[in-house]
Amino acid sequence: MNESSIDGRLPALPARHRMIWRWHFYAGLFCIPFIIWLSVTGAIYLFKPQFEAWQDHAYEHLPMTGAAAAPSQQVAAALAAAPGTRLNAYQIPRTPDSAAQIIVGQGESVYRAYVNPQSLEVLQVINDDHRPMQVVHDLHGRFLIGDPGSILTELAASWGIVMIVSGLYLWWPRDVRGLGGVLYPRLSRRGRPFWRDLHGVVGFWVSAFALFLIVSGLPWTHFWGSNFRALRQIGQAEAVKQDWATGRSAEMAERMAMNRPADVGDEHSQHRHGMTMAAPSDAGVVDTAALDRIVATLAPMSLAQPVKVYPPSQKSAQWYAWSLPPDRTQRVKLTFDAATGAVRTRQEFSDKRLIDRIVGVGVSAHEGQLFGWFNQMLGLLTTAGLIALSLSGFMAWFKRRPQGLLGAPPVLLGRGVPAALWGPALLLGLLLPMLGLSMIAVLIVERLLLRRIPGVRDFLGLQPA
């Protein structure tokens, strides 16, 4: 790739190539730890359905000697085991001898109670945030630090796009003498040439899948996702509803809304209409008799599991049920008349807006759930490829780094950013605001600070060649 910083050939490289290589180097330097982290946690999360089926196996095939109690009674048992909580959702037992999973909450906390549907024995109550796959989910997208972690993930993902696109440019064969080192690594090579071959070849094969994973994950991030939602809201009379939360704060706000009854906390709207209404003392109590009617309506529908029934809250003023299989394209949402249990509305995946369908398909594929085990294997190979890409890039750098220096491609004397790079840089900066802001910050810090400190300037390769 003509990239040695010590063999005297660098001055012959075009300014554009030098600049792209430099940005590729720094993008990789920043991204490698995050790529390895996201790849490992993402690979684990691919197998969430299988893991949680194993995790819950103790609550399957329960000994049953008679008919199950009413769902309302099961909910009452769960609430008694978790005092002070409110019903968030009732998950219909997967089989007649499976435990009912009842989700209850208080404030920002959510708990899952496993209840024997016949004896009403509460088998276990666990904080949902402590379930292993929820921990992996939070490690993957937020580093367990909430919105700051989501922003950091988005920043790494944005620079990951720079790394991949610039890497493809550097990989592009300009003097083809065979496919070795282009489409497959030359295994007979040793040392740095071998690692460079491996880095370029793996990068080529994994690039399209890696770009897909990055782009499909952006709607879930705090900064990009929130702005994406704001753009969708333009020109819409009603608030845009999404099936996903953009960051930890949005998720916590949603939990708080679910833990507040629908008819409490709106005093201002009552005063605006000239009414003074005292909230009933039992306003926070859910009419669980409606749950019994709704579950009876759902019984013959054979919706894809799991199926959860949600009571009215400040999130939604009506009872609704949601079929939530891992493949989002198979999900169904229904609303109900609480008095009769009759279905009011039914929304299939095909009924959603186009952008919601695109995001839904993308996330299902991202999580390895769109087309079965092959999707999981493809995701696993992609994450393994990204780890190999990161390690081979590190080794290629480690083998060539000059003693006492970082080994970054030095800048060219009197040469700024080539004109051909301004367009792509501006486009990426607009589409990925965190990338644009960080690029500006890097350029300012480099030019105004780092180049003025001799030791730092030499170490980073900022001394013009």
Residue ranges, per PLM feature:
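Conserved histidines in hydrophobic membrane contexts and catalytic metal-binding motifs
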Residues: M1-A465
